[in-house]
Amino acid sequence: MRILGLDPGSRITGVGIIEGERLIHAEGLVLGSGPLPARLGQIFERLQVIIETHKPTIAAVETVFMSRNAQSAIKLGQARGAAICAAVAAGLEIHEYAPRAIKQALVGRGGAAKEQVQHMVRILLKVDRDLGEDASDALAVALCHHHIAQTNRRLPPGVTLR
């Protein structure tokens, strides 16, 4: 199972692709500071190219966290929409995970610090270089889905974690 992890953002969108616990691709799509509709178009178009190149079979996306700034939350929701549309247009099944669930799956604590999650991503994928915050976050989402899918395969029929 090749998993596309997405950490959408209106300035930088994190992208990570894994197969099992093997790193296939990781990058932060820097979208610049142009008008929001142009940046949303970039997310869609650049993800289409990445999906076509690396052929993931499933997409895992971080859900929106509540922000005190309504405008930021709206922009984040729009970036998520562009990313999800690119994945759906490519025929990928979408799975969504809350930030606390991702931290729980990787670190064992839903309240883990971002640095702890990034450290676990590097350990699990056996990577000794800095992947960048956005790519690392996307890989964390992909690893979360991988771990949950593995666990669900071991459970009796009809029983799942989610």
Regions found by a protein language model. Name each.
Residues 1-162:
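Phosphate- and other anionic-substrate recognition elements at nucleic-acid/protein interfaces
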